[in-house]
Amino acid sequence: MKGRVIVLGEIEGHEVAALLEDGRLEDLALDDDAAFTPGSILRGTVGRPVKGLGGVFVDLPEGQSGFLRAPKGLRPGQSILVQITGVAEEGKAFPLTQRLLFKSRYAIVTPDAPGLNVSRAIRDEDIRKDLTDLATEAMTGADESLGLILRSVCEEAAEDEIADDILQVRGLAEAVLKDVDGKPELLVDAPGPHELAWRDWGDADEVDESPEALDHHGVLDQLAALSGPEVRLEGGASMWIEATRAFVAVDVNTGPDTSPAAGLKASIAAARDLPRQLRLRGLGGMVLVDFAPCPKRDRHVLEQVLNKAFRADAGEASMAGWTPLGNFELARRRDRAALPGWVA
């Protein structure tokens, strides 16, 4: 089907949400069996500092541990509020931040980051002014340290829905911020896949939650393809993506094309699709790409394609550049778990 479709369903009792654009899988949300998932807000207890790593460990509920980088003014035993920012690798602590974000469908409340802001994606000045006035009224009486961001989906939403949403998320933020003292505790759980789809994927041309929706829209077939390392590209080229404990290895092959431009064409196709593949597979950390052979003078073309592709991706990424052996190195934040076994 053409257009933007959100598909909701279950696989072996696990919630699944898929975002399709013109039939192609663009984003995915799956049940995660981890103790805590990115976005969860907790009360923790400051543990020992680790000078060599530039941070402190934080005791979390259920005997779990988190790691907070560059803390300021914290003492061991102190209770603090933290938010999970990524996935904990096996045997490692959860990455944490003290910069909390309270997200809802229309608004984001930002403690200690004051100001009322409207998404830059909304360009109509009259709409921006109306939304600013609405936000100002909804935040009347709030602590001056609370900021607010109105999300792009507000452009087409009814004012009363936006106002109710702001008041609800503001109330949640105010209640949590008062609940600092005490033992480690989960205060706000991250949304499940279906709720996350409603909150973060905006409006769609269709939302299908019928029993056969995953099969009907081809989601199951596309998930099966993700369970293997090979990604088929245009012109018979391919990209192999394999995760090791240290990094994600990506190998790009030209296939049957033997023309002089084959290497560059295959590498450009791989660069364009790489952010989507990493996102759907739940892969992050260091990524090392062995592009198909092409002249050094064409490397700047690949860099431009990579930068454009990752700018459009929601995950944070940094481009380290070319290694002495001619591979390209980048890093992507681990913002979700790798595909679980029940997906295949």
Q: What name fits each language-model region?
A:
Residues M1-A35, S40, E89, T97-D143, ...:
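Extended, charged alpha/beta regions that create polyanion-binding interfaces
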